[in-house]
Amino acid sequence: MSAVIALVGRPNVGKSTLFNRLTGSRDALVADHPGLTRDRQYGIVRHQGGHAVVVDTGGMGEELEGVGGCMHEQARAAIAGADAVVFLVDGQAGATVGDEEIAAELRRAQVPVFLAVNKTDGLDAGVAAADFHGLGLQPVHAIAATRGRGVGELLDAVFALLPPAEPDAVGSDGPGGIPVAMIGRPNVGKSTLVNRLLGEERVVVYDEPGTTRDSIAVPFERDGQHYTLIDTAGVRRRARVQETVEKFSVVKTLEAIERASVVMLVTDAQEGITEQDAHLAGHVLQAGRALVLVINKWDGLDPDQRRKVRRDLDLRFAFLGFARHHFVSALHGSGVGLLLESVERAHAAAHRDLATPELNDALQEALANHQPPLSRGRRIKLRYAHQGGHNPPVIVIHGNQVQRLPRAYMRYLENFFRDTFDLYGTPVRIECRASDNPFADKPNQLTERQRRRRQRVIHHAKKREKKRKRRR
């Protein structure tokens, strides 16, 4: 097991900035906006040959009701599971009542606490730290997370007290497994579904659209298979995205789609299938990611409403015939147990190796069942196929005049290969390449005999044309 370092403090003291500095990433969303981080974000910090798991938490102590109370509980959970706590305070704002309350709570936690005075850029470190001696936590480390000043000395002190990590406890890419991104509109139940799959209140859930603002990666294991769930912020229509923070959240959601191997698109059955749901599905299809459709809040619908939702699915998601549908209730757990089975199947299909002889046999069978159409009086010829990539599977077909293949025939080939190789759950991309003409770049040089013959043909053609004119 790796040691765990929790970053705690009031909102907007620089915890996410320090998290990004320690992990060498930009995983935590950072903006000059208090309360931006709401869920626990995990990363790996490496220092002088050692490593540890670092946890970014939401702000503590500002409000204990609603979302603020949920954030406080998430921070407490991080403290309870930590081997060391870095308590960040704002050197420019000075010590506050909120800092004193958090310090009192940390003293009761029975865990090593390191007080870090952040935002000391342009300030005398000794003067900035002096204001916080009254918190009763020693020693005081003055740092500037944005520039990295003092962070190395802070890590020296923290790692000196941490238990040694096992050599192979953390891979070079951090927690592994199948990366699964949860996407959808705000308040459709993504975080509730994540907590249901994990079996714990891992991310903040509240009956308010936009509770999740950052993309939170949560590694876990089920039946020997490792996964990384990525809970994302809800994406609204562009016209409704006003705040800068929300715009950054949308970007992080789109990045999560690119990072994922499988995407779960969560929709709200009570609100029906909307254009925005179809728009998000289009993003997944464009990225080429495997997809599982989750229709949440299914338990609250009567039979007529369920029939309407199924009709809307067929209408708006007609282009997602390859994706499996699951009708679930994340709140009560009905239907959730089969989701990971679909995730594994989609992931396996997206990364399947397709042997070239089998692809060519399938191509010949497809041609025998349905020949390509004529183009300008000539038959389009498809000669051979091979695999060109994974996630999504790419099948490259070589032939003549392939650039004139109709879109309908491309869909036929896509569906044929999907049925033949069981590529359900993932899009399949067909790339057509025209066979090279070995004489394409060579000048057309005639022999002497060919030139004389060409001149005779031209001469006779002119004579025939003159005779026709005289007859008129």
From Swiss-Prot:
Ranges of residues in domain EngA-type G:
3-166, 178-351
Ranges of Basic residues composition bias in the record: 450-472
Q: Which GO terms fall under molecular function for this chain's record?
A: GTP binding; ribosome binding
Keyword GTP-binding applies: yes
Ranges for domain KH-like come to 352-436
> What is the protein name stated in its UniProt record?
GTPase Der
Q: What gene makes this protein? A: der
The record's PROSITE patterns line, in alphabetical order, gives: G_ENGA
